[in-house]
């Protein structure tokens, strides 16, 4: 044993320090004294003999000499086995090799790489460690499981690299692959595409890429995982849900229903999720639609938290809503005001129907303009000629001309818009060479066949339509349709609240239609009459909740409703306003009775009134008077207070959700109402947008996908996209009120420290930067007016805060600015100290 250890140490002696050698000598000395054996056969052994000279007893014993060789062979592997816990041994195999040095044979342990065609090997004794093995796996095979590596990324907007650590995780990589299939709508068999597989293998040869069947299974598992997360999230939502429902027919001629829920979360951000996208069999009767919708709500356990349902104006939907309300009332779902606010008709669909009725009056002229567009776009050569004329008229050639779609009135508007834009080019094209113009268009174009005579009619039509004087009414028509188009776009948004915009927008449309009825052009008057009939039909049955949403807009309140009521109803407007106020109070009373945190304010009546009530023997009447007294008092403290305050003066874009978020403490019940009412969707665009994705998922090449996997793909994409947006998108709604002072402080610290300012007068000279900071902060005055009541006070506080920051950062004497620091409110001082501590 002594010879084997000493010789092995001599072979590797150049790797060790002399102190380690002394420790080993001491260890050998103790072993020699305890086992009473030992021989010296090499020069280093003679040194050990000299050291052991005071103890000569171990040398004269020859009997243990034949045993040292087998003992290390048995004990050494046992000691090494305890240390073979590293994961590198999954890719290396230990082998013992016998080597001869100076005529003596020794055993060395080497680790051989297990990868094919790799002949790398490294010494595997315990004192060599595993660093060499890991370096080989990382550099030659890109495989070091669990090891942190460095990745380099470009910082956005800067020419610098950001180096961040990352750790390879096979499970995470597989999840990313299946998320890519879902989010980008790749086919399942992409995992079997030859070059895709080669690409993945080039990045990581042992990546476990599987078949399309396995990919489908993983996607279903991911869908169930995300579904469970969403279920838990919806369970914790405190507000009510508004829903949208719509139908769609795929290329398989299968009908799909999409149900989307909308709510305002605790951060007052509007959220939406698709909770159902499934195949509906059989006839689309109202009863079947109601049963399907109710089953979805029960499945997600939100049937008792519904506020409204937005639908198209179909007869089956009318029956479905009636049945849904009855079903929910039977299940004790506690609908708001017994479902009076539940049914919301799609505003965009109403505008579509009204505009189509108006366009039907001038269908002949629309067809002529449509024929002109077809004639121009009938051949590439004709289109090139038009683009040359457009260049000569300094028009944008990339704009193009849209084509009319019979089911979408807005496509008619876009066609008119583009035709009017290219009007100078069309006139130039017509006058350039009429005969050549006719010959170029003698071809078949989609649904139209143009002969020479027919083209003469088309050219004549162009002369009429494009004639400057006679074409003015087309410009008027375009302006009329633009009002419909702009309002449709405004009400189609899903990332912001649209409920408060409906009433004002529809009142403006009604006012315009009334004006068009008296227009000097006969065509416009005919259109206006047709539009007015359809508009009045839906105006009478519009949901009162959308007027409530307008009332909850601090820019309008009850004043806007009174304005339009007086305009439309004349002297009888007060009756309609009083009816609306009664609806508001009824809604307020409902939320007051349901709110556990409703304020219970003491009555303002005199003591004699209380004594009379206490002595009253009619308990029911007494309780009623108490309830009435408390109810009236709460109203006077909150609802009437809101109505009595002046309108908010605000120009530009207004974030109504942020405004109400800052009033939770001031209006606890009204904020609950606003949180539910402002989540109403006035259009079904949110559900219709899912059908565009459905058309790509269930395309002609994948029309055999089952309804279950279709729902998994559509829903998972929607859920992941929403959660991903929540990770990186930070809006003003998500910034707490108290953090604005900290934000201003940090910006001022940047001006003070980073830009090299060392004393207060320098900072006073940089007031332009300070003004820009304040202007950026006051863009959302709905938050800022809670902290800073006007601009100049904010500016004064910011300058004082700047002085305060300069003193702290540069160690100036504090007493000269003591009075300035005293002006700062405590809600600014505390974040200032915290921010400076972190800084």
Swiss-Prot record:
Q: Where is this region: Disordered?
A: 32-85
From which organism does this entry originate?
Zea mays (Maize)
Please list the residue ranges that the record marks as compositionally biased, kind Pro residues: 55-70
Q: Which GO terms describe its biological process?
A: DNA recombination; transposition
Question: Anything else of interest in the record?
Answer: This protein is coded by the transposable maize controlling element 'activator' (Ac), which is able to activate chromosome breakage at a specific location; it may be the structural gene for a trans-acting function required for transposition.
Stretches with biased composition (Polar residues): 32-43
Q: State what protein this is by name.
A: Putative AC9 transposase
GO MF assignments: DNA binding; protein dimerization activity
Q: Please provide the record's keywords in A-Z order.
A: DNA recombination, DNA-binding, Transposable element, Transposition
């Amino acid at each position: 044993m002594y010879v084997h250890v000493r010789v092995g140490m001599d072979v590797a002696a150049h790797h060790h320090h002399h102190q380690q050698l002394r420790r080993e000598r001491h260890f050998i000395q103790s072993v020699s004294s305890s086992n009473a054996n030992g021989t010296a056969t090499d020069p280093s052994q003679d040194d050990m003999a000299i050291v052991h000279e005071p103890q000569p007893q171990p040398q004269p014993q020859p009997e243990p000499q034949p045993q040292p060789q087998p003992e290390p062979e048995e004990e050494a592997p046992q000691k090494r086995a305890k240390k073979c816990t590293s994961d590198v041994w999954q890719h290396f195999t230990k082998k013992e090799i016998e080597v001869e040095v100076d005529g003596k044979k020794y055993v060395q342990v080497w680790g051989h790489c297990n990868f094919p065609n790799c002949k790398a090997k490294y010494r595997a004794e315990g004192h060599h460690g595993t660093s060499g093995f890991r370096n080989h796996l990382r550099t030659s095979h890109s495989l070091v499981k669990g090891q942190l590596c460095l990745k380099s990324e470009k910082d956005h907007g800067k020419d610098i690299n950001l180096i961040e650590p990352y750790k390879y995780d096979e499970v995470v990589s597989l999840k990313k692959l299946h998320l890519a299939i879902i989010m980008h709508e790749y086919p399942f068999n992409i995992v079997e595409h030859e070059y895709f597989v080669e690409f993945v293998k080039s990045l990581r040869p042992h990546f476990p890429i599987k078949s399309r069947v396995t990919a489908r299974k993983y996607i279903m598992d991911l869908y169930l995982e995300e579904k469970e997360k969403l279920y838990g999230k919806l369970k914790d939502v405190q507000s009510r849900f508004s829903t949208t429902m719509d139908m769609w027919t795929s290329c398989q001629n299968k009908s799909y229903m999409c149900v989307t829920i909308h709510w305002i979360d605790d951060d007052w951000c509007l959220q939406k999720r698709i909770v159902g996208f499934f195949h509906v069999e059989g006839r689309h009767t109202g009863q079947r639609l109601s049963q399907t919708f109710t089953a979805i709500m029960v499945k997600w356990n939100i049937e008792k938290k519904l506020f409204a349902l937005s639908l198209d104006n179909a007869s089956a939907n009318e029956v479905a809503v009636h049945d849904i309300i009855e079903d929910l009332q039977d299940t004790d779902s506690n609908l708001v005001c017994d479902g009076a606010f539940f049914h919301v008709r799609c505003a965009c669909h109403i505008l579509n129907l009204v505009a189509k009725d108006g366009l039907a009056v001038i269908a002949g002229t629309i067809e002529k303009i449509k024929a002109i567009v077809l004639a121009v776009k009938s051949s590439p050569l004709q289109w090139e000629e038009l683009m040359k004329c457009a260049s000569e008229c300094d028009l944008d050639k990339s704009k193009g001309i849209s084509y009319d779609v019979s089911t979408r009135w807005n496509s008619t508007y876009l066609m008119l818009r583009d035709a009017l834009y290219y009007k100078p080019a069309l006139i130039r094209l017509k006058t350039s060479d009429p005969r050549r113009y006719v010959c170029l268009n003698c071809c078949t174009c989609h649904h139209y066949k143009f002969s020479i005579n027919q083209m003469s009619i088309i050219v004549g039509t162009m002369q009429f339509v494009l004639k400057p004087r006679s074409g003015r009414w087309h410009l008027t028509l375009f302006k009329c349709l633009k009002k419909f188009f702009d309002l449709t776009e405004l009400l189609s948004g899903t990332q912001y609240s649209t409920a408060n915009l409906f009433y004002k927008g529809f009142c403006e449309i009604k006012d315009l239609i009334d004006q068009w009825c008296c227009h000097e052009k006969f065509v416009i008057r005919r259109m206006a009459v047709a539009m007015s009939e359809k508009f009045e039909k839906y105006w009478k049955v519009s949901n009162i909740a959308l007027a409530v949403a307008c009332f909850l807009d601090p820019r309008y309140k009850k004043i806007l409703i009174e304005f339009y009521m007086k305009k439309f109803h004349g002297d009888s407007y007060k009756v309609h306003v009083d009816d609306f106020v009664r609806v508001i109070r009824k809604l307020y009373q409902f939320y007051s009775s349901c709110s556990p945190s409703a304020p219970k304010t003491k009555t303002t009546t005199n003591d004699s009134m209380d004594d009379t009530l206490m002595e009253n023997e009619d308990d029911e009447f007494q309780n009623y008077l108490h309830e009435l007294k408390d109810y009236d008092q709460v109203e006077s403290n909150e609802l009437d207070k809101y109505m009595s305050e002046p309108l908010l003066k605000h120009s530009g874009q207004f974030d109504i959700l942020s405004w109400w978020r800052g009033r939770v403490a001031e209006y606890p019940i009204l904020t609950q109402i606003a949180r539910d009412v402002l989540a109403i969707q006035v259009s079904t665009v949110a559900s219709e947008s899912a059908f565009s994705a459905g058309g790509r998922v269930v395309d002609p090449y994948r029309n055999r996908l089952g309804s279950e996997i279709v729902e998994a793909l559509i829903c998972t994409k929607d859920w992941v996209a929403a959660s991903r947006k929540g990770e990186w998108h930070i809006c003003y709604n998500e910034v707490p009120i108290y953090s604005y002072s900290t934000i201003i402080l940090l910006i001022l610290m940047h001006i003070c420290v980073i830009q090299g300012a060392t004393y207060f007068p320098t900072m006073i000279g940089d007031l332009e930067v300070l003004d820009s900071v304040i202007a950026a902060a006051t863009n959302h005055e709905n938050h800022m007016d809670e902290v800073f009541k006007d601009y100049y006070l904010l500016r004064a506080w910011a300058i004082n805060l700047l002085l305060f920051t300069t003193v702290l950062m540069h160690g100036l004497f504090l007493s000269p600015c003591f009075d300035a620091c005293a002006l700062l409110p405590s809600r600014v001082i505390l974040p200032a100290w915290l921010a400076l501590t972190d800084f």
